Amino acid sequence: FKRSGTAVLDMVTYDMAEAVRGANHILISVQAQGFEEVFQELAPLLENGQTVSIFPDNFGSLILRRIMRDKGITTKVIIAGYDSLVYGARLVDFNNMETETDVVNITYRENEIRVDTLPSSDYEDYLRIVKEIPALDATQLVHGDTALDISISNVNPLLHIPAVVMNAGTIENWGIIP
C-alpha cells in the first residue's frame, strides 16, 4: 500500500462550531486527557445523523455519551471508538499553516483495526456509513466486543510505560548529568 500526493483541505479553523456544522463525519484524535474539554464543547454542537469516530477511544466514547447525558443532549449520533490510530503520522515541515509547504509523513498504516460503537447496536449502521471516509478505505475494520473492550485493548500502555520506567533516572536528571 503506497500513496503519495497533495491533500487539499476544504477548511482549516480553530472554530469547532464551524468545523462540525453540516459535517457527516467527525474524526477525533486527541490525547485522552483532552477528551473532557473537547467533548464539553463538541456535545452541544452535534447534529442528528452525524458520526463521531474517536482514534484511539481510550474511554472517549463513554466520556462523550456521559457528557451528552449530563447536558440533556438527545441528538441522534453514532459514536465509534477505535483501539488505535489508523495511521502513524509526523509533521516534517511546519510553516504555521501560512503557506502550502507543510509536509506530513505517514510512516505506517494499520491493515486492520478494532472498532465498536456505543451503543454496540449502532455498529452495523456505522459500518455502512463509514465507507464514505477515504482514510479508512484500505483498512479492515474488526468488530470489537464492546466499547470497554476497545478502550482497554489499546497497546500504548504496554509499549510506553515500560520505556518511561526504564528511563526514569535519565528523565528526572535531564540536563543535570552531562
Positions of predicted regions on the chain:
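Conserved N-terminal Rossmann-fold NAD(P) cofactor-binding segment
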Residues: 1-23
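General small-molecule cofactor/ligand-binding pocket signal
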Residues: 13, 80, 142
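Residues at or immediately preceding the N-termini of alpha-helices
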Residues: 16-17, 35, 123
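Flexible, charged surface loops at secondary-structure boundaries
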Residues: 19-22, 46-47, 108-109
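Short glycine-/small-residue-rich Rossmann-like dinucleotide-binding loops
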Residues: 24, 30-32
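Structural motif
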Residues: 24-25, 51
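Rossmann-like NAD(P)(H) cofactor-binding subdomain of soluble oxidoreductases
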Residues: 32-99
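Substrate/ligand-engaging "lid" and interaction regions
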Residues: 86-178
